[in-house]
């Protein structure tokens, strides 16, 4: 239409309140998610070694929390696959080759379930993942306005959802998913 003007907003200049208004946030927990998302997007937009290490740390920590939750193996596997579908790096994804003793298999194959209902490669999974958990580094999560795209914002939101353990709480997950759909 000739009478329609499109307003293009620079995403990196918007505040938490701006995003809360644009996304029609109705719950305080969603504001906290937006705050964390903006902190992550400014860190991840650098696309450097530190941001990749932090992504690996967040993914590994989320996987560890799911693995040691009180759920059946099939549910744990589904949640881990969900994490790795939404959040992945070259080092942590479903198709990465994980070296074992005398063999190599994809990370996806490590989650096959045996006749006792356990992961066949539970030890291999644990050893591989714990290499990426880094609780010693003090990560800079301060929001610094820097150029990013809506796709970068979506990635940051996905990492926010896994880092806050929202997969483990149905109520929180529902609120977070509503925010994800609006974005």
Report the location of each language-model feature.
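P-loop NTPase motor domains
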Residues: 1-183
């Amino acid at each position: 239409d000739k009478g329609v003007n499109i307003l293009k907003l620079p995403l990196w200049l918007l505040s938490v309140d701006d995003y809360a208004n644009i996304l029609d946030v109705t719950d305080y927990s969603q504001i906290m998610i937006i705050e964390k998302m903006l902190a992550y997007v400014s860190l991840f937009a650098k696309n450097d070694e530190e941001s990749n290490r932090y992504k690996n740390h967040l993914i590994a920590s989320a996987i560890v929390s799911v693995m040691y939750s009180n759920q059946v193996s099939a549910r744990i596997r589904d949640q881990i696959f969900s994490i790795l579908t939404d959040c992945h790096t070259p080092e942590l994804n479903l198709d990465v080759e994980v070296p074992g003793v005398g063999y190599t298999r994809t990370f996806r194959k490590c989650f096959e379930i045996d006749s006792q209902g356990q992961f066949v490669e539970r030890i291999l999974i644990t050893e591989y993942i714990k290499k990426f958990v880094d609780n010693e580094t003090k990560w800079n999560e301060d929001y610094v306005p820097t150029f990013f795209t809506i796709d970068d914002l979506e990635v940051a939101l996905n990492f926010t959802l896994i880092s806050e353990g929202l997969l483990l709480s149905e109520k929180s997950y529902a609120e977070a998913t509503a925010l994800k759909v609006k974005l």
